[in-house]
């Protein structure tokens, strides 16, 4: 009798819970945009500012120092741009610090996430341009693979290449001509290439790098490409020189 009573009570409880449960169904979705702009600056939240202040002070002390000065606006775009030329040239420039003499350099334009405005360049500006934790990298490619690499660069409409590289590509992404320092690429020769580790792994459709040999990929904090850029800019600033670059026909899209 006692067991039957318990079973009856459990059954009643289950029915009660089932009858009280709600089954919701989504009937529609509405949304609106909340604009976050200078309107909020007129009524700052004191408590929020008090919370942020110590962190802001520390961040500003890292991001605000000036590391160089841009003589002109430097942006990144395909097939060739001032910023892409500058960063590729910096990769070649830093080779001496690693006992390297690169024949040329390649930097992916997709890794350049901002631009340098004319005037002072802060560490924070460099972080905006190069936000990823990429390291400087040196590899060797056979000439036949260099030609293949340049073909892959043509297929995406251009990447950052250093001074001395001259590519002519078609509007539909075919490599028409490739020269290095005015000479044709020797398919049998070895070429030393400066790049970043992400690109050296064959990413961004630059798969020719997967055939590279003799990789040197230092992994210290100072080997981050961002630090390499800062080092270059500080060296220029110490010499009283502004940072600048120019379009010089490294990658040309043929009219026909």
Predicted regions span which residues?
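Feature captures C-terminal
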Residues: 22-37, 86, 92-94, 100-105, ...
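Hard-cation-handling environments
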Residues: 31-116
């Amino acid at each position: 009798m006692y067991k039957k009573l318990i079973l009856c009570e459990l059954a009643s409880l289950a029915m009660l819970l089932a009858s009280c449960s709600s089954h919701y169904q989504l009937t529609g979705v509405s949304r609106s945009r909340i604009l976050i702009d200078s309107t909020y600056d007129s009524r700052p939240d004191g408590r929020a500012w008090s919370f942020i202040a110590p962190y802001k002070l520390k961040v500003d002390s890292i991001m605000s120092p000036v590391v160089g000065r841009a003589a002109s606006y430097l942006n990144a775009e395909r097939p060739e741009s001032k910023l892409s030329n500058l960063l590729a040239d910096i990769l070649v420039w830093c080779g001496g610090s690693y006992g390297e003499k690169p024949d040329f350099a390649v930097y992916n334009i997709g890794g350049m996430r901002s631009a340098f405005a004319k005037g002072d360049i802060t560490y924070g500006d460099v972080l905006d341009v190069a936000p990823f934790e990429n390291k400087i990298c040196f590899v060797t490619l056979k000439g036949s693979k260099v030609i293949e690499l340049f073909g892959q660069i043509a297929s995406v409409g251009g990447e950052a290449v250093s001074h001395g590289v001259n590519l002519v590509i078609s509007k539909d992404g075919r490599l028409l001509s490739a020269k290095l320092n005015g000479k044709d690429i020797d398919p049998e020769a070895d070429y030393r290439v400066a790049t970043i580790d992400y690109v050296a792994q064959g990413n961004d459709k630059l798969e020719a790098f997967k055939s590279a040999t003799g990789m040197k990929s230092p992994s210290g904090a100072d080997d981050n490409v961002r630090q390499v850029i800062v080092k270059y800019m500080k060296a220029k600033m110490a010499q009283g020189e502004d940072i600048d670059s120019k379009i010089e026909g490294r990658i040309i899209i043929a009219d026909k």
